[in-house]
């Protein structure tokens, strides 16, 4: 399973570790992803999404129904 937020599209980015001597070694910054069950009142069922912490805030703001409508419009499965 890829490390991509289903709501915001956040994905890993690359950067450098920097030691005290400023030596650079490659590393990945991973999004703060969680599998979370959301209750969809209109469908009377739970939906499990892999979302970042920001994605959960978006769902709190817009509502799960609106977010699922956006996912359907993009053709994503959930």
From Swiss-Prot:
One BP term from GO: translation
GO cellular component: cytosolic large ribosomal subunit
Residue pairs linked by disulfide bridges in the UniProt entry: none
GO molecular function (one): structural constituent of ribosome
Gene3D superfamilies: Ribosomal protein L28/L24
Cell cycle recorded as keyword: no
Pfam family, any one: Ribosomal_L28
Superkingdom assignment: Bacteria
Keywords: Ribonucleoprotein, Ribosomal protein
Family membership: Belongs to the bacterial ribosomal protein bL28 family.
Name this polypeptide is given: Large ribosomal subunit protein bL28
Gene: rpmB
């Amino acid at each position: 399973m890829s490390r991509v937020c289903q709501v915001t599209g956040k994905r890993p980015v690359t950067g450098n570790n920097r030691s005290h001597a400023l030596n650079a070694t490659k590393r990945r910054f991973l999004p703060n992803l969680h599998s979370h069950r959301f209750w969809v009142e209109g469908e009377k069922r739970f939906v499990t999404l892999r979302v970042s912490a920001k994605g959960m805030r978006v769902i709190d703001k817009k509502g799960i129904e609106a977010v699922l409508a956006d996912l359907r419009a993009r053709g994503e499965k959930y």
